[in-house]
Amino acid sequence: RIFCIMIPFVHLHVHSYYSILDGQASISRLVDKAIADGMRGMALTDHGNMMGVKDFFNYVQKKKGGASKDFKKAEAQLKELQAKVQEAGTDPCSIVLDDGKTLADAMAETEKAMEKAKRVMDFKPIIGCEMYCARRTKFDKTLKEDRSGWHLVVLAKNEVGYHNLVKLVSRAWVDGFYMKPRTDKADLEQFKEGLIVSSACLGGEIPRKLLTGDEEGAEEAVMWFKERFGEDYYLELQRHEVKDPAQRANRETYPLQQKANEGLLRLAKKCGVKYICTNDAHFVDEDNSEAHDLLICLSTNHFVSDQSRMLYSKQEWFKTQAEMNEIFHDLPEALATTQEIVDKIEEYSIDHGPIMPNFEIPEDFGTEDSYREKYSEADLYDEFTQDENGNVVISREEGEAKIKKLGGYDKLYRIKLEADYLSKLAYEGAYWRYGNPLDEETEARIKFELHIMKTMGFPGYFLIVQDYIKVARKELGVLVGPGRGSAAGSAVAYCLRITDIDPIKYDLLFERFLNPDRISLPDIDVDFDDDGRGRVLQWVTDKYGAEKVAHIITYGTMATKLAIKDVARVLQLPLSESNRLCKLIPDKLPSDENGKVPKMNLPNAIAAIPELREAEASSDPLMRNTIRYAKMLEGNVRNTGVHACGIIICRDDITDWVPVSTATDKESGEKLRCTQYEGSVIEETGLIKMDFLGLKTLSILREALENIKLSLGIEVDIDMVSIEDPATYDLYCDGRTIGTFQFESPGMQKYLRELHPSTFEDLIAMNALYRPGPMEYIPQFIKRKHGIEPITYDLPCMEKYLKDTYGITVYQEQVMLLSREIADFTRGESDNLRKAMGKKLIDKLNHMYPKFVSGGEKHGYGSETLEKIWKDWTAFASYAFNKSHATCYSWVAYQTAYLKANFPAQYMAAVMSRALGNIADLSKFLAETKAMGIVCKGPDVNESFRKFSVSHTGDVRFGLAGIKGL
């Protein structure tokens, strides 16, 4: 069919692979196709959820960012060409450029490039959801008709609409879930502002009623929506005609659609409601239809060969404007009305600055109102734009921009109140940790850190973390780890007992945790004993409110092997062949000619492995199709889960900002709230993520301490044990570390016997070095400790930071400190250097190298020596370890070794009690216990407890739960 006029069209009913096991389309491919086809936008309307919305929004913003750069580049080129025209003073058609084009042609091409970029810049991501609307109310969950609901497409036309859609979808999950997440008309009426609604597919209320002959009921439904949504309510037409007689597809849908469409057009005219056409897209291209069919087989647990299984019409691809024009050539207004909807869509962002939860500060300390009376805006400006010593360090313009980024002066009063209270707690802790008065270095460090926390706007974060850690220790009886990750570099965190490692003593750096040159959210991971973690989370939920606390969703995708197995199963490829194909997939692909390791996916694996190429070209159609469709399904979302440790604590109801869904806790069976956006992007929306980790080793420590108390009547404060305990170092020197944390592998035992660690610093270094890559330096480290190899330094000043590791650079913090010592790098610059070296960012390193050399030369160091140091750093930096983390976990390891050395029976009983479900580990630990000379008595119904126990004589009694099958 030939058309004189192509009517613009956009897709307003689209499913991605976030319509889990129903949609097969990746968001990036959908957006790319829409842009390539010249569409002005597209909607994302996954079934019952908004899980793909952040991915959708981010990808469109990425495309727009690239287009903006292209536009500016082309604009600059056009100005240069126009200048040449003015300079020549002649017809641009007569001027020939070096590439043979005329100046006029070059200008036309440049203008065309600008137009193309502008179309992408103007592309509109339309956020929506195909919701399930309960046939009665969302609280009715008894009848068969309550199990799903009418389909309804809901689109957000502006920011208000987005937040209302978030509310609707969240409430559908939290309150209305019954087989499906269901909204109802009461909620639709309450949250209608800013929303555009269409009647959806054959599963919608109006089409269903029309098909059952209930014309009156259909009209009532249309009028209900029209009265509430007015001109933002549309009827939706679809046509999925199967034209290929040989194709196995659902041919019953199209006649029903045509019948429903007739009724919809009658109602549109009678009720004065406009109509649109959609294609209910579930996959991107026509040749993806069979892959989508396989996905439906996976979803419904059928083989492809099953004759009675569910079938789609296979017409549900993301059709081009031309294809939609052909299908709806007789209803041009249905195409044109999609443009009307696009025109209604406003530009807005779903991202937000940090939304810090409010920490309750005692009124006798101060309130926001009292601070407003006490401090002027000028006072706040000075405090938040000067350095910790009151020096002016930024311009007025930069200062005002900083105030605005922090939320304006109104927000600053809250931040200052929290910062002052944080300062009070920090100094109280500092006097307890370091004594009063503080020495000059400690005073300066705490003052600097508190200033950075305040001027970044995050004092409330630290107040909240120290609060739940304090409660965990003092009220809930939960063992808390000494810290993990870069947070241990903060002296303030140490003073607040967020961490238990002295960063000043161990040269741990605050800027490794918070870079003063770049505002970024703090990230404090906290370890709790895994028995007590749940109690801490419950306390947090009770304190802040269930509506303000949520877990974070995770998405399970079809990785390479899983895609092969899934496709092979529904195609009924023999299991032996499926397993053979999966075994061909390596854990890691070989490096290419440039030394880079390709991303693991099926196309790259096929390129690298001849046997997979043979399978792809096999004469066996089952084998060939397995590879073909596995490539198409690879990366599809297959299921959702819950982040192992990430928790959101919000100032407001979380559904004021992002959608939530629900999941079932595996242990308690309780329903958990989860954000529908995953952890990698959730903070972009302003929500604050905190990590609560369960560490089995802490449970072992806690249980060992209980065993000591029960059997010996002694209470041991594990956080206060001596760091110089001789028995503990004897244990390490002998390599008797089975059952201890992080030092129990045979290889580590061997190196410990060679090293003979005599200081805690030796243990930290071994913990950092015993990994692939830096492990090769361990023999040199051992030789230098024992004087077999001389300890050398490229510069005398390097001894200050390398002496504890015998002249070998082991930690990232050493590189940071030395860059400041040698070349006067700032704190922020040293952290940027650490990141650039660790990630091998060549451009950034090349930019920093001249500063390093010039800074070193100012101190009188030779350029050759500086070049050698730089090369050594860049070679080793990708292996260098985070000393803060190594120190924290070495302390936990030391605590386990201390208990094993000093309370062996009590400790090993705890270790075995935590290995009840693993016969191999239990046998290993039982053998170690006997080798230590401890009497291990068998199980006895009269004396055994569930777990392993220790008698007053020091014998270990076997726990009943350790008996297989009991």
Predicted regions, residues:
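Alpha-helical scaffold/interaction cores of sigma-54-like transcription cofactors
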Residues: 5-966
